[in-house]
Amino acid sequence: MTLLTAESRIEPGVWDEWVAKAIGSINSEVGARIYGGVSTVYEDLGETALRCAEALRLLSFHVLDGREVLTPRYGEEVMSERVLPAFDSTEMVQCLVAALFKQDREEVHRLVEGMFRFFRESWYLLPEAWNVYEELFALLRQRLRKSGMTGLDYALRGQPDPNIYNSYAGLETVVLEDMEELKRLIDQNGID
């Protein structure tokens, strides 16, 4: 959400309150969770694209604590306080390879759930979580090929649409689908 003012200046705090009331009213009316990325107030029409991009970027913060109104001030606070611990992709790959070769669906699910629990608890944004998964998937393919799966031909499909997969659970579903496909290919092709 953006606001272009023509004649009188509106303080950012007032704008944030208006948006919070509007979103709160919509949420209670429709009975659903709606999130609003709110840009700073601006006076120059030439800033419209920049402010829309700012509001869109802030929407990715909704996964952190379920806040409905995501303001630039909130985004700055989060980014200044947040320290992302590194995810140990190497250990995860070892565990996943073992579970995939054993065709242990429950263990694969447990590992993926643990990875996403780590992302949630560490306040990873969804694009950051996906980047870690892309790295992990590349290491996983490499490790499977070294283990004799030279015919493995499964590529990561690219980052899912953030408008559809806009939660940890959504991304976790995509990752579990990838793991199921790898498990199926291992079962089907065996080791060379």
Where are these regions (language model features)?
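Cytosolic nucleotide-utilizing catalytic cores of signal-transduction proteins
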Residues: M1-D192
